[in-house]
Amino acid sequence: MREHNVSVWSEFGKKINSARSKIRLPKGSEDSPKRFALRANDKKQEKTPRQKYVYQEPEASVLLNQRAVWDRIKGGEKPEDALGASASVLKVHHVPLISVIVTTYEPVIRYFEQTLISILSQTYGGYELIIADTSLSSGVRDTLDHYRDERIRYYSVPGNRGEASLINDAAHLAAGNYLCTVDVGDLLTKDALYEVFLCIMRTGAEILYTDEDHCDAAGKRFDRPNRKPDFNKDYLLSNNYMQRLLVIRRELFLALRLRDSFDGALTYDLVLRAPKSAVRHVPMILYHRSSASEESKMAGREPDAEAAAEKAALEDYFRVRSIRAVVSYTGRKGIYRIKYSPNIFACRSDVGILGGRVLSRTHKVVGGMFDPQGRVMYEGWDEAEGGPMSRALTVQNAFAVDARCMKVRPDLQKLYEEIVEKPESEPYVDWQKDPQELRRRSILFCSRVRELGYLIVWDPSFITVV
């Protein structure tokens, strides 16, 4: 049974008392720091009905313009001239070649062909397609004979090779500056590599990832859009969220390589080991994950193999860094919980604040995590509601968190007292009736902490009830 605490401001200038009655801490967590609670106005919010998702391909004029940009670059123009107005923000001035790697073993040819067509239909032509085929039959090779394109490089690979070994060898053979993989059956949107090219030119990214959705085996119906956050370290430590499309600089890939021992979580292990300073998110759906590819990947694999591999990758991440942490399953697919010993501040010097959720007595979210506009994330949601990808129930980094449910790094306690606690010289404010002032001070304190270079971690299992 989880422990309960409540702290209440009784009058201006007094420090938060430590009476325990209504704060629920994560199981095994350390004692709560000073905090205060105010009575929330528990109004039931009406939710906007969820609209059916429809993937919208870019307009024809947009795709034509992208092709025109590539044609001009191919014709010898400098990228900054071909791109026109957006060239002023370019950090890279050489055109990247992207190596797209597809591994095959006796694939269903119609699925392979769908994937092939989606790659050959790219508006950005600066790529090569590497097919590493371990099939005994000639189906893949015969299909490629109908698509004679100088950018296709076919390799027949003898023997029964693991996916990690195949991709590592293909990466050595690749001529590109960047690499990505596409599973048979999955589809790239027509503008996928163009948007990757733009991101590379503008940011010089080492690793890029995009949003994705799911499609049926025919590639006609789309659902379950996965709109991902920008790089979020603690969300990555809780969930293999980058997934597809993942693009990485070839030199970095060759330095890290995929490891056979993490089959089922190869790219997750790779990203966890990679430097994070040059990771960039392309916030567009550029990859369609097919039900056909998912069925193919699960064939011959234990049902829990992927989760076990992801958990092992996380455990290896902490072991290498000598961080005492226990990784456990949460019961939600692909979501993990990390328990630090003795606590997160002792284990990680990059964390300044640990925040949680503020719930009403009717188990509705009334506070906890704030977005940059100062709005409460998931406000009005039920306590057990996770939303898409269980994001509302997953540990992640936050812009700001609520002072009513907050733990502070010991060496930041003085700053906390200066900003959050009321100095004696100010007029009395009834915090029970002034949630805006509480929100303002919470966000100001968190902003100062982030300016000092610390992360703010939001843990939805750390709860205050008001």
Please provide the spans of the model-predicted regions.
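Conserved donor NDP-sugar-binding/catalytic core segment of glycosyltransferases
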Residues: 187, 191-222, 345-375
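Short, acidic, metal-binding catalytic loop of nucleotide-sugar glycosyltransferases
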Residues: 116-126
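A recurrent flexible, glycine/aromatic-enriched loop bordering the glycosyltransferase active site
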Residues: 164, 222-247, 374-412
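N-proximal low-complexity "stem/linker" segments adjacent to membrane-targeting elements
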Residues: 45-118, 329-344
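Glycine-rich, basic loop-to-helix element that forms the pyrophosphate-binding segment
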Residues: 157-174
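Short aromatic/hydrophobic "clamp" motif used to bind/position activated sugar donors
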Residues: 179
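A short, conserved alpha-helix in the catalytic core of glycosyltransferases
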Residues: 252, 261-285, 314, 397-407, ...
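A conserved acidic beta->alpha catalytic loop
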Residues: 133-141, 159, 349
